[in-house]
Amino acid sequence: MKKADIGLVGLAVMGENLVMNMESKGFTVAVYNRTVEKVDAFTGGRAAGKNIVGTHSLEELAAALERPRKVFLMVKAGAAVDGMIEKLLGVLEPGDVIIDGGNSHFPDTIRRTKLVEEKGLLYVGTGVSGGEEGALKGPSMMPGGSPAAWPVVKPIFQAICAKVEDGSPCCDWVGENGAGHFVKMVHNGIEYGDMQLICESYQLMRDLLGMTDAEMHEVFAGWNKTELDSYLIEITRDILAHEDADGSPLVEKILDTAGQKGTGKWTGIESLEEGIPLTLIAEAVYSRSLSAVKEERVAASKVLSGPAVSFDGDREQMLADLEKALFASKIVSYAQGYSLLRSAAKTHGWKLRFGDIALMWRGGCIIRSVFLGDIKKAFDKDPELQNLMLDDYFKDQLETAQAGWRRVIAAAVMNGIPVPAMAAALSYFDGYRSERLPANLLQAQRDYFGAHNYERVDRPRGEFFHTNWTGEGGSTSASTYNA
């Protein structure tokens, strides 16, 4: 019997769909699940008659695979991955490849790569984006780990991943150890930002402009034919047209509390570790946290007053402004995300190809959009681009959008409608383009209470000074206390 090209462990929906995807591309797949009944149900059901081999133990799985053996883990991130790696190390041999396709935290992937390589095996931590449908029809894939593993898994990965219009695969090698899962983490953070920006646009249409769901559906349908063309705009269009059993808009029946799995939080924490302002994505995470305290908000709505919502302007002009505000804010979100990627690449020694990452996100994933092609062009033109907003195309788009962007946020503020992500985006834009910020006063405060020193505008950078602000503190500066 022909040996299988690859094995997969974990037959939840994502795992099953990846198996079906691989088999449809001509690969024979061996499968294993901790509860073996799941294996039999799968091979006797939707996998019946296909080149899919069921196994009831990891030993049987390993024996069914051609060398070098490749085992794709689709198990819950965390301890389950560590446990499965430990078991696989007992049945695999040097040169074999273990692949983790879950949403693992990148420090875990760095640790696991080292562990597996020390045993003589190879390790791949790959981000997989696109949900259940993407897994079946072609996801975006972001692999990192042991560089020697890439030639081994590349034929399978690039066969099953999504493709863009010219046939280019939405999968390429990202970098060593945890690079792939780091890029997937930032992808998810940007996803949080995109979703929040769309929700703020929806709230402004509904609460400020008094639009019906049918009218908003038409607006999003129109936007999906512009530079905002994207998967998330597309599904928002469809959601707004979906009716409940009684014929009313279903979305208005859904409780306004949003969940999260933690990848957005990881992105925000990592931005703090790297010292990179990721303000929009952080606000998107906090907005979900605020939505979760529904009972508190209901109580507060009866106590805390705000302005009466009133709009007597030109609705079409406001919608045009809102389109520009959404696009400009989206540019800022990606600019911040790419700044984090650039900083982390230096910290971890990853040689990230930023334009290629944009291409990986062009198809198959949740943030796929036409816009990503412009990011690819920006980094192809200048691989050392410091900030996406400085690219000629994006600079021009921000300048065109700026007046409408400001009008939208001003209208939201005056009417008491929260737009935390859009407002954070504009504040970042204004801060980034400011030659002078009030941090001189902040540093003076730090020197006053903590003797933390400061630099002077009339002296070379790197030369530090301390002032005895009270006449009692002396001339000693701080070395251990920091604030």
Model feature map: region roles:
Residues M1-R69, L92-G95, G131-A135:
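NAD(P)+-binding Rossmann beta1-loop-alpha1 motif at the extreme N-terminus of oxidoreductases
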Residues V53-E60, A77-I85:
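Glycine-rich, highly charged phosphate/nucleotide-binding loops
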Residues V81-E86, I99, H105-H217, K225-P249, ...:
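Rossmann-fold dinucleotide-binding core
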Residues H181, R206, M211, T226-I331, ...:
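Interdomain hinge/lid region at the active-site interface
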Residues G222, K346-A378:
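Small-residue-rich helix-loop
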Residues E399, G404-A483:
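C-terminal amphipathic alpha-helical interaction region
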